[in-house]
Amino acid sequence: MEGIHMLRDLLKRDDYLIKIDLKDAYLTVPICKAHQKFLRFLWKGTLLEFACLPFGLPREKLRKIRKKCQTLLSGTEISVRELSKFLGLLTSSIQAIFPAPLHYKHLQRLKNTTMSSTQSYEAIVTLDTTAREEVVWWRDHLQAWNGKALFQQPVDLVIETDASRKGWGAYCEGVSTGGPWCSEEKRLHINCLELLAGSFAIKTFTKDKVCAHVRLMMDNAAAVAYVNKMGGTHSQTLANLAIALWEWCLENQLTVSAQHLPGILNTRADRESRIITDSSDWKLNPSLFQAVLRIWGPLEIDLFASRLTYQLPQFVSWKPDPLAIQTDAFSMNWGKIRGYAFPPFALIGRCLRQALSQKVVQLVLIAPVWPTQPWYPLALQMCTDLPLLFPMSTDLLEKDHQSHPLTNLQLAGWRLSADVSKQLTFQRKLENCCWQHGEEIPPVLMPQPGISGLAGVLNGKSIPFQYL
């Protein structure tokens, strides 16, 4: 059948097109005398018929769809026959409305389900919330999306993606990344995980891309099909994931296509999806974190986190992450932010040096109470408030509902600053330490296990903990 698909195959780069305004030229195309009676219309009481070729205005088609949408929204039920007609009206617009397939698949599934169970076109379909939302989209967005590019934009970015039962992986332009699934994601079918991996990969590697066409290389045929067709009707979960991916891409002015990559060649992304070895990615119990916010908030950026452990809407990851605003906290300037840092313990000293070198005004640090560590005296010196001592418990730290293996870990929260005036203001409020060198520390009335009640002594001043 001749149409826009044939034209796309005939044209090539640097061809010239001539546009003819048929507003007048179409009047030169005659209609067979015997067929003119089929082109009659009534105007001001007079019956007229076309002797030449008539052309309808595109806006009339738009009005027809919007009018039908309004009719559907005025009620809650429709027959399968009428729904089929409406779907035919929508599917006929695919060549002109780019995101059309995203917004009728639920209606299509509703029709198929009803037809399968009743075997009758006269059966009544009740429009649920999702169905009505699709109709509303057509009513409200039809004009804005009217007009679709004839040719697909050239590919700007190629991303290889893969999924395993452990996690997801991706590779793009020499950079590899990946991460584990959360407990809810692990229960999904592998096809869904493959599509989710593609979604994570796009969000990870397109943070600085606008108006770009992204090509996903995937070794799962179902995921490829659902991306290219903007959804499907066989799997509701897969369809929802595909719609969510496309809506995010359109919101960020991106287009996406998928291509099958044989599994034997998809080695780089596959490797990332199976090597899940980050044992330092944990977060403070959310209830304790909220207590920290109430005392020292608001805080702006979580400097050491991942999509499974972040505590603030904006966070920085140590490797490319779909939700992180940036990678590598040490490459940032902390001087003008109210940062929250729960770094791997081996990086605590580096964090303190970064805060000093960048003259950080305030940093909330979560760190263990390890007085013998080289960084500990510096942490005491930078304090601007009494450190918060967290109770030891099995749920002190968590990640995806898992407990940290170190059940006797003693953590504290520290409000730090590189501003010497703030440090001195805090130190003036402290009491003098009355202990002499060599004296035994007196027992506290309400001792914390393994803790004297003091964070330490600085310049002859005692720095006690405050307890949560």
Language model: regions and residue ranges:
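Conserved catalytic palm subdomain of right-hand nucleotidyl-transferase polymerases, strongest
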Residues: 1, 6-28, 78, 82-85, ...
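A short, polar/acidic, helix/strand-boundary loop motif
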Residues: 2, 45-55, 71, 142, ...
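C-terminal reverse transcriptase regions that engage the nucleic-acid substrate
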Residues: 9-12, 49, 58-150, 263
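Two-metal-ion RNase H-like nuclease active-site motif
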Residues: 18-22, 152-165, 302-306
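Reverse-transcriptase-like RNA-dependent polymerase core
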Residues: 23-48, 55-61, 99-100, 106-107, ...
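C-terminal functional segments of enzyme domains
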Residues: 94, 255-296
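RNase H catalytic domain
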Residues: 202-271
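Class I S-adenosyl-L-methionine-dependent methyltransferase catalytic core
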Residues: 300-468
